[in-house]
């Protein structure tokens, strides 16, 4: 709410001013937003937080969680090269910087050189890594109303028909990644297949290939 936003911004403003007085740099806008979200989640006692990095991973403001339930790495491309590196492998190494000791890693099935970087980091941190089974995706339908697909997960679990209202083949790949992540999270939370399928069916991403109006 607007009241919550003002309350936490006042707290962070006070701390930011103290940091500057002590000779430290003023937090960036993203660092402020990250701190605000952590304070809010703590006070509201949320059950689960799906935390997205701002850029990269290793040096990202969000990369302070010591023991996440799982680490999820999505598709890796040539983004933010001036900060993350000039090759896909260097960028992958920065992204893999969110991998924590002993935490399960679930990753999009990127090109082999990228997968190798992720596997190497996971091995170093004693983590089990699971990749999306790209061969297990079968597109059933694609339209302006959304997509449907079947999926055989990496552990053999069969999803006969998953429906998502999001547009684009990449969203099918993202949904498969979400399914793999949920398979891991089931070790901690009771999540039924109905809840999984219903959640994906109701997923909304405002402003991302969103149809605003139809004739």
Identify the residue ranges that each predicted region occupies.
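Glycine-rich, charged/polar anion/phosphate-binding loops
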Residues: 56-59, 133, 165, 208
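Short glycine/threonine-rich catalytic loop with a Thr-x-Gly-x-Asp
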Residues: 166-179, 204-207
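Acidic, Mg2+-coordinating active-site environments of NTP-dependent enzymes
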Residues: 19-21, 44-52, 68-161, 175, ...
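A short glycine/serine-rich beta->alpha loop
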Residues: 20-25, 163-169
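Short, intrinsically disordered, charge-balanced linker/junction segments flanking boundaries
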Residues: 210-215
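ATP-dependent carboxylate-amine ligase catalytic core
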Residues: 1-66, 82-84
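Short alpha-helical
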Residues: 57, 113, 204
């Amino acid at each position: 709410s607007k009241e919550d936003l003002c309350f936490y911004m006042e707290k962070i403003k006070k701390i930011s001013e103290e940091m500057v007085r002590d000779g430290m740099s003023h937090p960036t806008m993203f660092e402020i937003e990250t701190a605000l979200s952590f304070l809010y989640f703590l006070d509201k006692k949320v059950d689960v937080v799906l935390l997205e990095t701002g850029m990269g991973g290793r040096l990202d403001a969000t990369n302070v969680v010591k023991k996440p339930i799982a680490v999820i790495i999505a598709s890796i491309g040539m983004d933010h090269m001036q900060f993350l590196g000039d090759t896909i492998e260097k960028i992958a190494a920065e992204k893999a910087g969110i991998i924590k000791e002993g935490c399960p890693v679930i990753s999009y099935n990127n090109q082999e050189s990228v997968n190798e970087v992720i596997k190497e980091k996971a091995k170093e941190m004693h983590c089990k890594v699971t990749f999306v089974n790209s061969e297990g995706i079968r597109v059933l339908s694609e339209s302006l109303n959304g997509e449907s697909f079947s999926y055989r997960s990496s552990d053999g679990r069969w999803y006969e028909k998953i429906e998502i209202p999001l547009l684009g083949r990449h969203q099918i790949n993202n949904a498969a990644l979400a399914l793999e992540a949920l398979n891991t999270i089931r070790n901690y939370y009771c999540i039924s297949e109905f809840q999984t399928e219903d959640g994906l069916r109701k997923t909304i991403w405002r402003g991302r290939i969103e149809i605003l109006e139809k004739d």
